[in-house]
From Swiss-Prot:
Mg(2+) binds at S160, E202. It comes from Brevibacillus brevis (strain 47 / JCM 6285 / NBRC 100599). Both phosphorylation and phosphorolysis are carried out by the same active site and suggest a common mechanism for both reactions. HAMAP family: HPr_kinase. CDD domains: HprK_C (cd01918). Homohexamer. ATP binds at G153, S154, S155, G156, I157, G158, K159, S160. This is HPr kinase/phosphorylase. Its cofactor is Mg(2+).
Length: 311
């Protein structure tokens, strides 16, 4: 399970540390946030202590109505051992009881100028990105007409050369050789390049080239959602390859199924153009037009018409 900690949250959102600074190393393991209104009212049967606790205008104003003894009681309960931190929105003033218990138990209290709803959205997106399951796959990720295409195949089969030709044709490179893939909670896969090899492409016989330096900033992008996979393999004469495109196969990456097509490689085939057309065909299918199904219907209608004319 991936983790992050409170200090990463503070740095990313430039939050103010009000108290409990010694707890900045506390781990954050879930993306959900909690607004502990019921617990402030004295309901202790359930408390999501693994979540970041958020105090907006409602929570602070209600907390102010409690007696000093009740405030201490509520804070001692809320600042349990697994609570990562407390975030106070809109730069509100924080009650002394919260500061005192925070310093005593080492639970950070952070302050942000953002509105509560805005902070919830931003922190949730940040945590989903930091805590998303990750894997690394050998391949090349490109952006072709807005479609994220992951090109896979054995070493030396021509993935990088195809990517170079695609860049020359106006498409964009995301990652070459190693593609880091993250899976969001919705099952979407996003790919990027490790920082060390970002924007770099290796061509056998030429060496390593920097795509952004050579072709400009418009030829690269840092992150792209993966929508289809193209598997390159050496042509096998006795193997049956898909010719109509009616049967759709998928590849499982982590828990997500991605459409995959297999393209046989042999001398004289322009791989870049084939991959480009595959991406355009994918877009057409997504828009509701399937050329293979359209052809099949026309063929079936023609057969029926011939059968009727013979009667």
């Amino acid at each position: 399970m991936r983790k992050t900690n409170v200090s990463h949250l503070v740095d990313h959102f430039n939050m103010t540390i009000l108290s409990g600074e010694e707890g900045l190393g506390r781990e954050i393991t879930v993306t959900d946030l909690s607004r502990p209104g019921l617990q402030l009212a004295g309901y202790y049967s359930y408390f999501a202590e693994e979540r970041i606790q958020l105090f907006g205008l409602t929570e602070i104003n209600f907390f102010q109505t409690l007696t000093p003894e009740e405030r201490l009681e509520r804070m001692n309960f809320l600042m349990q051992s697994q609570v990562p931190c407390f975030c106070v929105t809109r730069n509100q003033m924080v009650p002394e009881e919260m500061i005192d218990v925070s310093n005593r138990l080492g639970v950070p209290v952070l302050q942000s100028p953002l509105a509560t709803t805005t902070l919830v959205g931003k922190v949730t997106n940040f945590l989903e990105n930091r805590l998303a399951p990750t894997t690394t796959i050998h391949g090349v990720l490109t952006d072709i007409y807005g479609v994220g295409v992951l090109i896979m195949g054995s070493s030396g089969i021509g993935k990088s050369e195809a990517a170079l030709e695609l860049v020359k044709r106006g498409h964009r490179l995301v990652a070459d050789d190693a593609v880091e893939i993250k899976q969001t909670q919705g099952g979407q896969l996003s790919g990027s390049a490790p920082e060390l090899i970002q924007h770099l492409l290796e061509i056998r016989g030429v060496g390593i080239i920097n795509i952004m330096t050579m072709f400009g900033a418009g030829a690269v992008r840092n992150v792209k959602n993966i929508e289809m996979v193209v598997q390159l393999e050496l042509w096998e004469p006795h193997k049956m390859y898909e010719r109509l495109g009616l049967d759709e196969e998928t590849l499982k990456i982590m828990d997500t199924e991605i459409p995959i097509i297999t393209v046989p490689v042999r001398p004289g085939r322009n791989l870049a153009v084939i991959i480009e057309v595959a991406a355009m065909n994918f877009r057409l299918k997504r828009m509701g037009y399937n050329a293979a199904m359209h052809f099949t219907r026309k063929q079936s209608n023609a057969i029926l018409e011939d059968a009727d004319s013979d009667l």
